[in-house]
UniProtKB/Swiss-Prot annotation:
Pfam family, one: TruB_N
Function: Responsible for synthesis of pseudouridine from uracil-55 in the psi GC loop of transfer RNAs.
The keyword Isomerase belongs to this UniProt entry's keyword annotation: yes
Taxonomy, superkingdom: Bacteria
Name assigned to this protein: tRNA pseudouridine synthase B
Gene: truB
Naturally occurring in which organism (per UniProt): Chlorobium phaeovibrioides (strain DSM 265 / 1930) (Prosthecochloris vibrioformis (strain DSM 265))
Enzyme Commission code(s) on record: 5.4.99.25
One of the record's GO molecular function terms: RNA binding
Keywords: Isomerase, tRNA processing
Family statement: Belongs to the pseudouridine synthase TruB family. Type 1 subfamily.
Catalytic site: 54 (nucleophile)
InterPro entries found in the cross-reference section: PsdUridine_synth_cat_dom_sf, PsdUridine_synth_N, tRNA_psdUridine_synth_TruB
Length: 240
């Protein structure tokens, strides 16, 4: 039998955990992994997260445990910083690599200067419409549910966002490597689509990594397996 004792290292009121979400994991997969670590020790503890990442995105995900989950709302309004890889010269319905390419265009006439100028035009305060392939609600259904049925909703919700900076770090056609600093709720894949549109060749988000949420940096984040080991290490688990 497994016996668990709360050790001195287990925060009584919970804690924030900075994790580096792996590729192809959902945000809930990460939460479940940490929650199950507590269950292994016989302790039921609430675990939640702030700022969902798509499965194809990696990077900083902030988890909260115990009473700290009540403080997750304080993180929701923080700015986010992403490293994005944008594929120019093609589009997808989902604006990312989750759906098939269409509308292939030649990009050999583009140079880094043109891409940087187009990106800078997307900076500032603006209205952004939620993409069809998103979890936004529309008349009781998620937009992605409607998209899978071939339905296109033209009057989708729009909200004001701020693109603080849209820096093009380098261009290796057809790819543009960018660092984008945005306000809460901004869709980076919509910005990727808009960049391609501005350049007249189309574009979609080919890769995404979140590197910061407010002052929290991905360099301080743990791997999921290290977070699990940390949780188990905070509990004294013995085999009887």
């Amino acid at each position: 039998m497994v016996e668990m004792h709360e050790g001195a290292g287990l925060p009584e009121d919970g804690e924030f955990l900075l994790l580096d979400k792996p590729l192809d994991w959902t945000s809930f997969d990460v939460v479940a992994k940490v929650r199950n670590a507590y269950k292994r020790g016989g302790l039921k503890r609430k675990v939640g997260h702030s700022g969902t990442l798509d499965p194809k995105a990696t990077g900083l995900l902030i988890l909260a445990t115990g009473k700290k989950t009540r403080e997750l709302s304080t993180l929701e309004g923080l700015d986010k910083v992403y490293d994005a890889v944008i594929r120019l010269g093609a589009r997808t319905l989902s604006h990312d690599s989750e759906s098939e390419e269409y509308g292939l265009r030649d990009v050999t006439h583009l140079d880094e200067g043109a891409v940087k100028r187009a990106a800078s035009e997307l900076e500032g305060k603006r209205m952004q419409q939620a993409p069809m392939h998103s979890a936004t609600w529309h008349k009781g259904k998620r937009l992605y549910e409607l998209a899978r049925k071939g339905t296109v909703v033209t009057d989708r919700k729009s909200k004001e966002i701020v693109v603080h900076s849209f820096d093009v770090l380098r261009v290796e056609l057809p790819l543009a490597y960018c660092r984008i600093h945005v306000s809460k709720g901004a869709y980076i894949r919509v910005l990727a689509d808009e960049l391609g549109e501005a350049l007249g060749v189309g574009g979609y988000l080919a890769g995404l990594r979140r590197i910061a949420i407010g002052s929290y940096q991905v360099e301080s984040a743990m791997r999921v397996e290290d977070a699990v080991a940390r949780v188990l290490g905070q509990m004294q688990v013995t085999d009887q």
